[in-house]
């Protein structure tokens, strides 16, 4: 199960941190161990670290209206979203 970091900009840190939408959207996709991070120098720059059992399912879900609505609710600026997937060195 890969660990993934998604970082992006937001409109309001306190609203984003308090929102249940992350869990509501990602939980049914099997995403676990969701942790949030805030840049102390720029609190509108944030990240989410999570374990994702099915990357294809999550990436497919990210293109839905439900994902767009969840991001809009949370104040995410979707054009700033970058997703990084845990990588292992080649053997």
Residue ranges of each PLM-predicted region?
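Short S/T/G/P-rich N-terminal loop/turn motif that feeds into the first structured element of a domain
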Residues: 1-91
């Amino acid at each position: 199960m890969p660990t993934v970091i998604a970082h992006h900009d937001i409109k309001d840190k306190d609203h984003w941190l308090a929102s249940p939408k992350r869990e509501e959207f990602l939980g049914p996709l099997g995403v676990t161990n969701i942790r949030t991070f805030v840049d102390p120098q720029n609190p509108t720059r944030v990240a989410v670290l999570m374990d994702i059992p099915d990357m294809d399912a999550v990436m497919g879900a990210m293109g839905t209206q439900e994902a767009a609505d969840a991001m809009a609710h949370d104040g995410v600026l979707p054009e700033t979203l970058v997703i990084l997937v845990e990588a292992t060195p080649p053997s």
